[in-house]
């Protein structure tokens, strides 16, 4: 079973930096529907996409895990 990631901090960073997901998607080079699939764990971010997002959002290397690799806590 693949892990599900919690992208809530990434979403907050996108809104704080670009004001809208649409503006971020234009700079990032993906459609809003593609980003939505990634943020909802239907598709995964590739390593080059993570690097590009970090560059656009000015996320330091030491903080990448906080934005891209925090797993969701499953509720029972």
Language-model-derived ranges and their functions:
Residues 1-5, 32:
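Short, Lys/Arg-enriched anionic-surface-contact patches
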Residues 3-4, 12, 17, 55, ...:
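Short, charged recognition helix plus adjacent turn
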Residues 7-27:
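Short basic helix-loop element that most often maps to the first helix and adjoining turn
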Residues 31, 42-43, 71-72:
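The DNA-recognition helices of helix-turn-helix-type DNA-binding domains
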Residues 42-52:
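Short, basic-rich loop-to-helix N-cap that marks the start of a DNA-contacting helix
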């Amino acid at each position: 079973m693949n892990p599900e990631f919690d992208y809530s901090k990434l979403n907050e960073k996108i809104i704080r930096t670009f004001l809208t997901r649409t503006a971020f998607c234009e700079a990032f080079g993906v459609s809003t529907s593609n980003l939505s699939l990634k943020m909802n764990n239907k598709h995964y971010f590739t390593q080059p996409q993570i690097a590009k997002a970090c560059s656009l959002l000015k996320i330091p290397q030491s903080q990448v895990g906080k934005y891209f690799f925090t797993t969701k806590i499953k509720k029972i």
